[in-house]
Amino acid sequence: MTPAPGSVADATGNWVDSIAPAWSRPYLRLSRLDRPIGSWLLLLPCWWSSALASVAAGERTPHLTQIVLFFVGAFALRGAGCSWNVIVVRELDGAVERTASRPIPSGQVSVAQAAAFLLVQALAGLFVLLSFNRFTVALGVASLAIVVVYPFMKRVTYWPQIVLGLAFSWGALMGWAGAFGRLDLPALLLYAGSISWVIGYDTIYAHQDREDDALIGIKSTALLFGERTKPMLAAFYGGAVVLIAAAGFLAQFSVHGGFVFAATLALFAAHLAWQIARLDIASPDNCLTVFKSNRDAGLILFAGLLLDAAMH
């Protein structure tokens, strides 16, 4: 299949290329709606946290309104974050084969147009955020500092994945705050577990570009870990499982629900172990496939939390 004009190298043949109006395609690519995996990975900690809060509150289901709001907010704010990232790193993107076709470095949109689109997406996210209680609104606003500094971290540290983890895991705090108007230890443990998960999967993602990154001075855990990537993934993924387990059991599962959660967590851990076994860091296609499978891992955990809540 011949890529559509202006399509991004690692996301060809998607709905944006095939059915979206031509004028909208650069903007949809700018917000990464041609590659929704990032929105899912931002959304899932929100859903985990909402489900965990419903367990702690003894409710059978999370509030449907919050589930929908988090869905809309995750796609809007991930789009805004991606737009900001592309604006900041546009010169670096232009020097990397996989990212040179992105809308700004390829000339499909100007920086001013991208900034205007960023503002539209940010306002949509703000509209969603204002639907929550005051504590949650303040918590959401606080996350902006992390989002702003993340694109610059690739130039100064081999651990930008930690900063990404802080940003992408923020939903693990938001769901609990949305339910209770405060933060408690289960939410903090869930947040820490999600950060460890993000560091793992984004290390996998970063292996796609490690050769280009090394040439132009972009740093990442993929370059730092190198051939030690698999044992390091085992450490971070293992930490994620332990921390999420602690969060779950502190949320006071029922006897039957505790069994369901333990079984679900075992499936989640098995999926992470499968990723490590399947991973071939020398193959960009393999890295992308394994990275994308984390949506399934996150949905497994969410399903288990929902089932436990329903058993109360």
Question: What role is predicted for each listed range?
Answer:
Residues 20-25, 242, 246-312:
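Extended hydrophobic alpha-helices typical of membrane-associated regions
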Residues 46-88, 98, 122-130, 137-148, ...:
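Membrane-embedded alpha-helical segments that form the functional core of polytopic membrane enzymes
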